[in-house]
Amino acid sequence: MGPGGGPITNEGAGGEVYHTIYYIAESPHSKEVIYAGADDGLVHITTDGGNSWKNISPKLEEGMINSIEVSPHNPSTVYIAYNRYKFDDFKPYILKSTDYGSSWKMLGTGIEENSFVRVVREDIEKEGLLYAGTERGIYMSIDDGISWHKWQRNLPVVPITDLVVHKNDLVVATQGRSFWILDDLSPLREYSDEMRSKNIHMFDVKDSHKVLRSAMRRQGPMGKNPYYGTEVKFFLRDIDEEDSTVLKVEFMSEDMKVLRSYSSDSELRQNKIDIAEGFHTLRWGGNVEGFELPKGVMPPRGSQG
């Protein structure tokens, strides 16, 4: 009722009208299978290209189906990001079904209580590797949602509105802080329980190419290109500072000659490896070790001006 006792006038904006389809997801396995999620918590599926629909809504309080993700690995598996922030419930809700929505289960913990989830995506190469965009940043899971870990790094603490796994990168859309791209998901795809039990693990090294770059530089804002040299990524755990073990990485030619060497006991800062616990990236630009001049030979000197 309005203030004077009469009916409320519908202003026609539609904001007070619920039951609006909010998200539609077509299965990558079949164009006939389509999911539709609404802003009142209902989820429907069609398996005949839209000729008929079936209600597969999870038994939850009224909320919004913010995104739907059909697994790129299993046609019967689907994830939904569900939220109730409009009801002052800011808890994170991620649900999974392995039978086309006939039954649902809530995925695990690890996401902050007040970080409601806007989007969830599964990695296109590694099954069970999930990424979740929340109101306060990004989380990832390596065990198909049983546990979640915050994965913020240098990304601003900002609402994540969408995520896309594009080839080997994760593209992030934020609310108010532009687009961000995480280059090279390879270490996450290699990560496993077996690796976690090892004190040291070296990830697969990609092929690299040495190129000559122009001295001319474009002006203005631009994206940052990947490192043009060779990157060696490795993981260390249970590091004892008193341990005398030396960590050494050598780059060698086809005839097994050492081109460049790095070690944890090097006296040269540019050749020294940090042995702190965690993930590390060693970069080699293709330059080789210098040589020592014979005694009595002086290097050339010159000036320009």
Segments and roles (model prediction):
Residues 193-200, 251, 298-303:
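Short intrinsically disordered coil segments
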Residues 29-30, 239-242, 289-292:
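Extracellular acidic loop/turn motifs
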Residues 144, 253-257, 305:
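Short, glycine-anchored, charge-dense loop/turn motifs used at functional sites
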Residues 1-220, 227-228, 235:
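Beta-propeller blade termini and top-face loops
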Residues 1, 36, 54-70, 165-167, ...:
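Generic detector of contiguous secondary-structure segments
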Residues 185, 209, 240, 255, ...:
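Short loop/turn segments at secondary-structure transitions that flank enzyme active sites
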